[in-house]
Structures are given as structure tokens and as C-alpha cells.
Amino acid sequence: MSGQPTAVDCLESSGSTVEDVQETPASREKSYGLPVRKGENSLESPAEQAAKDVEIEELTHSEAIAATGSTRKQCPYGGKAPDEPGKLADESEDRKGENTKAIASSPVLVAVDSDSSVELIESPVKFSSANESEKDPPKPDAVNEAAAKEAEEMTDSSISSPTSESFPEKDEKTNKENEQEPPGMEVDQDVEESISRPAEEYKIENTLKGHKRISLTEIEEHKIVDKKDDVLEVELEKGTAPKAAEDEKLNALLSDGDVFYDKECVNCNCTKLHKQYVLANMATLNFYQVLRKSSKQQFLCMGCHDTAMDLYEEYAGQLMAKQPLLLKDFHQDHADFVALDSSDEEEEEKQPEKSDFSKNKLQLIEDELDDAIKNVLNKVDFTAQLSWSKTILQAKADHLERQFALADVELEKVQTTADKMHCALYNSCPVAHKHLPTLDIEPSDYVHEVPPPGEIVRPPIQLGETYYAVKNKAIASWVSIKVIEFTESTAINGNTMKSYKIRYLNTPYQMIKTVTAKHIAYFEPPPVRLTIGTRVIAYFDGTTLSRGKDKGVVQSAFYPGIIAEPLKQANRYRYLIFYDDGYTQYVPHRDVRLVCQASEKVWEDVHAASRDFIQKYVEKYSVDRPMVQCTRGQSMTTESNGTWLYARVIDIDCSLVLMQFEGDKNHTEWIYRGSLRLGPVFRETQNNMNSSSAQQLRVPRRTEPFIRYTKEMESSSKVNQQMRAFARKSSASAQNNALAAASSAATPAGGRTNAGGVSTSNSASAVRHLNNSTIYVDDENRPKGHVVYFTAKRNLPPKMYKCHECSPNCLFKIVHRLDSYSPLAKPLLSGWERLVMRQKTKKSVVYKGPCGKSLRSLAEVHRYLRATENVLNVDNFDFTPDLKCLAEYSIDPSIVKDTDISKGQEKMAIPLVNYYDNTLPPPCTYAKQRIPTEGVHLNLDEEFLLCCDCEDDCSDKSKCACWQLTVAGVRYCNPKKPIEEIGYQYKRLHEHVPTGIYECNSRCKCKKNCLNRVVQFSLEMKLQVFKTSNRGWGLRCVNDIPKGAFICIYAGHLLTETMANEGGQDAGDEYFADLDYIEVAEQLKEGYESEVDHSDPDAEEDNGGPDAEDDDDFRPNYHYQRKIKRSSRSGSTQNSSTQSSELDSQERAVINFNPNADLDETVRENSVRRLFGKDEAPYIMDAKTTGNLGRYFNHSCSPNLFVQNVFVDTHDLRFPWVAFFSAAHIRSGTELTWNYNYEVGVVPGKVLYCQCGAPNCRLRLL
């Protein structure tokens, strides 16, 4: 041993080598806040230190014995009591005497080892030893003698740790620990170097090592006992009784004398290598972070018990040795876990009875506790511990700060290098910048010199001035002229009119003509804005007109017409011009010229082909101006040259729509959106004026145009009408795309005359407004609900996935009922997990089954459910990323007026809430299904049902007989539609099927939850009836609803047409719904067949061409066009000159604003309904007095639900089920609405305004 002391840091886990230091221990301890010894080495004399250390040693042994609960005889150094008590006791006394003698000669007793715990504190129940136990230990006597001799040779009173020279085995172990240390231990090494002890202290520690070798010999004896324990366990498993001697040894081995078998260790990370268990005390429970239960016993295996006690011994030894605790790195690895306790166990736990103490006793107890705590803290010098901890933490913080500063410098260097690389990369290909001259582009839509409003003044015509005048015919283009003379002429009625002799300008030869002031227009634009009905000529841009592939474009020129729309912001300050020949176009003010004279009734000056339409337009512009609402890509029937053709919307410009006709002609044309040439507008006019023809319902297409009305149209009811007396919702409502803001709702259902013979008076009665619901203006102050996002606390997380074949064993056993939860929440409460993955801007959903298998589509989920025989169904899953499965709309329970309006008839309760007043809905008997009344013969015989025999949950639509019924109906009108997109797609209906859906029925051999059974199940969605602010009662969803999900059916009384008319007069018709499936399907077929073009290709080629020369024929007919064709082929027609001038006739084919063909809307003679009887008419579903929750759905022009006809219990086409499906993802708390498909004007004397507030609102329902 060297003469100079060596400094060894106290950090146990660092294991760093010893370095020679020249500093004194006092200076180092003072620099790090440790207590400074007085004098040379210590604060106390050697004798006082020895006596105090003996006390610490005895106290430590007694605490260890008390903690383990051992009743065995203990040797002073943790060894086991031998079988011969006397002999070993004498040896122990000798060792104790020798050790005490050695301690008395030295002021230090305790030494802290760097790899285990305090040497003086050995666990009496320790069954495993260190590496030294594997070697042959020396004899106890020899060890004691060597330790005593070594203790006598100690001359220095300071404490020192062993060096690598004196303990080569320990140094080798320390080096191994250094290799396994993480990089973060450098901080502890820095702190270790700052706190050390003199090297001479290791002598006492050497002496104590001798005692540890004695204990190692005794641990070998414990191993023999362990082997006997193993034999004992084998015998217990075989059912034999253990031997008495072995039982006594086992009981003597245990700390508390009680050993248990077949128990469960409370340590969740237990390796389960031991089969012996002991009762867990509070110290071990706290170590493993387990709550104590008073109602049941808790056990620890012997290995976990020893581990906990060893760590507590290390804590106590470090504290009693007055060493900084923060220099000791205690590893305690515990994984986070959650203990699932049943509610029954919690109820069984009884609260311990509290004993009553008097105030004096309580005060005495508190004083005694305070004194005891203070004594313990003073004994371990707790104040010094706090000071040391502060110093160590500050040193670590300073070290981390220095490390962070170095990291910032390195990061800056790396960033600088990266910037240089970036610059070098992009400098290799320099970009040449070139400054171009400024380019000023004047916006084409910019408003130029919009004149102010004012009175229209027509100055008198002046001689010698330039004007515009008619050329040859009234509808031809007008050209520039000069007035040369005033003349007078006599009109047909005998009145004298002023005429003007004019000369045409820019002509190859002089041409003079006499015209009236009605055929002359001013040369300059008018100085004021023009109003509706003003007679003008306007410049027509011929480039916007296309009349076929082989036809030329009409030349641009001034043509006569009237002002249809004034300048306003909505049309970008342009005039809408209705030209005399039927064309329409928007024209700016600078291209409009005022006609010098016009009749008081301006339509008298208009060409006869457009006179009637313009007269009605001018008279009703401010009252009734219906126009078709459509979007790009939609199709509608449009009249072209006497034929109704399907045309597609190409573009929309305010009140004009650009239509492209299908067929060989394939021409485009701008048409006014209120023109009767458009099918929807023509039908509306027919409904209002033609009372003799029966009217069919509209074709329910998802993107079909509809008519929008204004609120100023009450006066239009003066027209004589004969219409039905009651309003009815159509069960075949058209579908909207609720997600598209520009999408339009379907057109209203067409009206029908009353089959029951009820007719209305020709004179319209007084208008009665039906908007009588109370409107609450202080809606913001009312208590509102809010959406709450729950989490599945009781859910068992999925297992780690291992490759296996899925079976029913993959599922968790669910003990709680799931009936009261929403369909999408059931998997998350049954051991499933729903993960939303994000990849850049794209999201995707992955379900993890209870066995850990990942499922990424509904097809995979369906296969998994079949393999595991799960009670869940495929409609309990959805892969929409934005959908919240556990979101729920919560309200104040105090405003709930009825907890369940179905009175238990539905599986899911339907509450009723009202936070406006205390009113309740009108009384209604709840009915889950339809109820036939007198005269309704509902045939429910199962023998008339077609059935299937599928065994694959009807997943193969090509083999299922029920699916084939649905597929056949769809492919009748759309043969190329893929079979995967027809009908339900894993119990989701994404679009309306006009021809109906046929579900599997009671005769089918498939399972009750097959993929073709949706509507026949009862309500599963959580819905809520509530009072709206302006529309009466409504229905909203409590949870999120995915797109295509089934909501409910519409149930009520089934009525005949006659009963509906009679009941409508008495009780009202607001809950009527037509079962009009047959009419819808038949008209869909008619619309499909009407797309076929049966006209002559030769006639179509020249219809409306610019070479038409007969101005007297304003309605070109088929015979005339054929005649023109023949004469053209024979060469009898005159070729036009190649050089055009203003003199050339620029006449266009006349286009009539009114159609030249009637749109057949009469009842088909071969209708399927006629097969059921001569007077057979659609049946009516009435939910006025009896019905289900479907009666509470309000109307919306942009609904989130659509209606689907489904055949379940009968295949009779007259009696489909009316089912509601979601048209889009509906968030919780949203009101559910559908399109009533009322038609405006079909009920005389009734006006109902729409208050849905949708962007495409029709404004009126009736």
C-alpha cells in the first residue's frame, strides 16, 4: 500500500479507477458542501467514532431482522444460525470480540462498497450470493484472524475505499460494469471525482470483507436448503406429505415462518422462477408500487421479496454511513401497468373502524412522533444530506449545461457545413435572371363607364345623321345608314305615320329604302341605364354559337331584341338580351343601341316566334321568375328543333346555361334558364296550366336540376288551375351530394290528380300560410348541448400479434352488455383498437383485433369476423378518418321531457328534449312497422318470396338470388355498372337505387346477419327528438354516423288514395308519404329510352343552319328542311358571295323560346300498376297519429339523408319499405333531414316557405 492516500469517488455505479490526488480530504469536502472534519481527520475522537459505529452496526442488524420478520437466530454478520447453537455462538462471540477490538483501534466502522450494498448490512433471507460465493470460501477462523491482524496494523483513522491494486477481483468486476454503463454516466463520474475519501479507510473495509466471506460460507448452506426445498416441492406436487425434518428446516429458513405455495406474486414483472411465497409487507408493496388491499392477502415470491429487501438494506446502509445518497445509483425498473379490479371487490372492502382518541392522547402521540422523527433525522444527519444533494444536483446541472453548449457548437458547425454543401450544389447550375418589360393586361370583366340611372329620352331623328336600321327582314342584322329625307306614310289602320328615307352605308352600290322610326336605332349608346322591356338592338358575338361540325359560325352584328335583365352586380353589369329570333346573350352597355321608337306594349314589336314568351316575361318579371337550378355536368331534357333530346350542362353564366346536345348533331347553345325549352321549366308550366293530364313523379336522380322560386309569386295563383288538394312527400326523393356546396337538390315530385275523384274549384281560394311554428329569437341564450369525446377505460388492449390462424379463441370474453352503445363504439369496448394513421396529408384507419391482427378494409374485417365467429357485425366498423367513434352529444338532463318516446319498443331509447318551453309533440302512438288499414291488401305470404341458399354471408352478389333481383333492376338502365357498386357495400348504401333493393328474407338459408340484411333490423343508432328554433320538432343524432349507414324506416298507417284524400281534409296531410316506387321506376325507363335519337340524320344536319333564306317560315319544319336539302344537292340554290359586306343577309335560323313539341307526361297505358286493377293508385303512408321516429325528420333542400325503397317481407311492388340512409358523414349533434319533394303550386291556397337555410334553398315548398 502506498503511503499517500488515494481518492476514490463514492458513486457506486461508475466503477471508475482510482487516481492519485494531492488535495486533502478536508479541502475537497469543503468545496462540495460535505462536513469538514476538525483537526487532521475527523470531528470525533477515534474512540467516540468506534463506539458510535458499533451502535450503528447493532441498529442496522436489528432493523434488518425486524424488516424481514425473521425469528431465527442470527449471527452478527448476517449468517445463518448453525445446527449446534453453542459452538457457533461461541465462534460468533469470538469473532464479535475480535471485530470489536479491531474497530476500537480505528475510528471508522462503515465502508460502502461500489458494487453491492453496505458491508455491515447483510440480508438474513438472502438466497443468492455475489460472484465470490461461487468460489471456495476460506475457513472462518483463518479469515477472522487475518481480518483482526489487518485491523491492528491500521494506523490512519480515515475511511478509504479499496483500490484496484488491493482487490484485483473487484477491479475486474468494476471494469465489466464500466463497459456496460451508458454514456450518460459521465456526469456521475465528474461528481465522483469531486468527492473522495482517504485511501487508508479501506483497511476497515477489508476487515469487514472478511466477515462477508464468513457469510458466503453460510450462504452455501442456504443453497443446500434450497435443493431440499426443490425436493419438497416435487413431493407436494405428487401429493405426498413432506418430511418433518425438512419442514422444520424450511420453517427455520423463512423470515416469518410462513411459506405458501400456488400463489400469485403481486410483482407484474416477476420472472416466476420461485415457487415459494411469503406475505408482502408494506415496504415491499411500496417498492413494487402496489396498493394494499385489506380484503385479501397479497404475496411475493422469495426472489422478488429478497430483491426488495436488498435494495432497502442498501438505502439504509448508505444513509447510516452518512454518505450522499445521490451518489448511489439505485436501479428500479418497473413497467407501467394498470390493475383491473372488479367493482364487487371494491364493495366488499370495508373501511377500518376508527378508534376514538382524546385530545390529550392525540397531542401526546403527535409530540412523540415529532420527537422520534427528529431523532432519526438527526442521527442520520439529514441536513447534511440535503446540502450534499443540492451540491451534487448543481454539479450535474453545470455539467449538462456545458454539454449542451458543446452540442450547440457542434450543431452550428454541422449547419454551416450543410449550408456550404447546399450553396455548392445549386451554384453548379446558376439561374440566369432576365428582366422583361412590363406587360399591362386590362381585365376583360372590368366594368367600363357604367352610365347612371335616369329617364330614357329618345331624341328626334335628324337629317344627315348616322343611325342603324333594319336591312331586309326584321329579324336580320341591322346596319349603319344615313337619313336623307322625311316622308309620311299611311299605316294599315289608317293612321298616318312618319317615315324616313335612308341610304345604306358601306355598300358597293347606292341603296335607298323607306322605313319607320321603329326600325331605326341610334348610332351611339344611350347615356342612361336601360330598364326591363326596353326595345334595343345589341351586338351579338357569333363566336359563342356552334351549330354542328360542318356549319359555319353566324357573323357578329347588331340584332333586335329587348332588355331582359338590367345592369346589376349579379350579372357583372351586363344586359341580358332576348333577341327576336330566340337567341339570348349578355351584352355590355357599350354594345347596346336604343331603338328610336317603340310600342307601349313592347312585345308587339317583337317577332311572332318570341312574342308570347316575351309578353309573359315582361308582365311577371317582378312577380314570378322561375329558373332551373343546375350545375356543370348535369343533364336534362331540352327541346331542339321539335325534338326532346338529352343535353348536358357545359357552362353557366348567371341566367344563361350552355347546353351541349347529344347525338350526331352535337351542337352547343346558350339557353335562358327560364326558357320552356328546358324540361324542368316545361313540366312546371304544364303542372300549373294543364289540369286534364295526369302528371307523373320526377325521376329521382342525384344530380338533377330543380326549379327555384321567389317569395313574390303569390299573385301568380290567379291563373286557373285544377290541382290536387293535399301535399305528399315522395318516397323516391332525389339525392343530393350534401358534401358539394354547389350541388342542387332534386326537382320536386310531380303532382298527380286525385284518383278518388276529389277536385278543387277553378277559382283559387285565399292563400293560407302554413309556416305557423313558433320562432325563438333568443336562441343563443338557451342551454345548448356539447360534444364529449370519451375513451374506453374498461377496454382490454389488443395482444401483441403473433403469426397464427384466427379462431374464436382470439376474442376476449366480454362481461358487460353493449346494447346501450352506438354501433361504432362496440368494437372499441370489446378489445379492438382503432388507429388513425397519417402519411403527409393523407389519413387512413387501421383496426387491430383482440389478437393483435391489423385490418385495413371492410373486406378484411368481414373475413376476420367470420373466422372468429364474432357477435359484432361489419357495420360496426368504418374506415373514415374524420369519424369519431366515441364522440357523443351531451345535454343537460334537466331539459329531458321523456326518456324514451318508443316506450321500450326500440332497442335504443329515444329521448325527447325541449329547452325552449314545456310543450310536447302532438300525441302519437309509436309503431315500429307499417299498419295496413281498410282497403289495403298486404300480402305477406312467404311462399311468394324468392330466396337464396348462400353460405358465405351473401358476399358473392353474382351467386345470391336475392342480390340478382337488385342487380337486374339496376342494369336495366345502366348495363355497364359494376356489380360491386350496386346496392349495399358491406351494409353501407352509398347511393340511391331507383329500381329498389331486395333483401334476404325469412326463407333464405343464409345467416341472420348476412351482408344483404340491413333495413329489417330495428333501430341501433342513438337519436334524439328535440325542439327546433323555427321548424317545430326535429330529430338529431347523438353519435357520429358514417356515410351510407341505415338510420330507420318510415312507419305509419297504410292508406288508399281515397282514404288519404278524406283524411287529409280532416286531420291534415303534413305526414303523408307516397309509395310511388312503380311510377319512379317506369319513368326512369322512359328517360333512358328517350335518350335514343330517332330523327333523320339528313334533317338534323341542316336544322338551324345559317344558310336558311326563307324569312316567312319562323318555325322550320321537317318537310321544309328536307326540301332545302334536296335543292342544295341539285345545285338549285344560289351560292353566297365570298366577299361579305353589311349588305349581305345575316339572318339566323329562328329559335323559339317555347318548345315545338309536347313533353309526354301522360300515364303509360301499359303501366305495371294497371295489372293490379283498373283504379289502382299509389298507396299513402300516414304517420299523423301512429308512426315511428321517421315522422320527426324535417325537410332540407340540402339534406343529409336520402330515401330508399327496400323489399323485405313482400315482393309486391306496391308495398316497399321506405328506409332512410345517411348521404354523408354526419357529426354528432347534427339534425337529420331529407327532401320532402313537395311541388310548388300543386296545393291551391297553401303556401309553405322553406326555412332550411341551405345554400341551394328553393325558398318555397308549396
UniProtKB/Swiss-Prot annotation:
Gene: egg
Record: residues binding Zn(2+) 1: 948, 950, 954, 960
Domain of life: Eukaryota
Species of origin: Drosophila melanogaster
SET domain segment(s): 1021-1237
Pfam families, per the entry: MBD, Pre-SET, SET, Tudor_4, Tudor_5
SUPFAM superfamilies: DNA-binding domain, SET domain
Amino-acid positions noted as binding S-adenosyl-L-methionine in the UniProt annotation, renumbered to this chain: 1031-1033, 1069, 1071, 1191, 1194-1195
Residues bearing the modification Phosphothreonine: 217
Residue(s) carrying Phosphoserine: 215
Keyword Coiled coil belongs to the record: yes
Tudor domain location: 529-602, 629-686
Binding-site residues for Zn(2+) 4, renumbered to this chain: 1197, 1250, 1252, 1257
Key word Transport present: no
Binding positions (Zn(2+) 2): 948, 962, 1000, 1004
Tissue: Expressed in ovary (at protein level).
Entry EC number(s): 2.1.1.355
Name used for this protein in its record: Histone-lysine N-methyltransferase eggless
Keywords of this entry: Chromatin regulator, Chromosome, Coiled coil, Developmental protein, Differentiation, Metal-binding, Methyltransferase, Nucleus, Oogenesis, Phosphoprotein, Repeat, Repressor, S-adenosyl-L-methionine, Transcription, Transcription regulation, Transferase, Zinc
Annotated compartments: Nucleus; Chromosome
Gene3D superfamilies: 2.30.30.140, Methyl-cpg-binding Protein 2, Chain A, SET domain
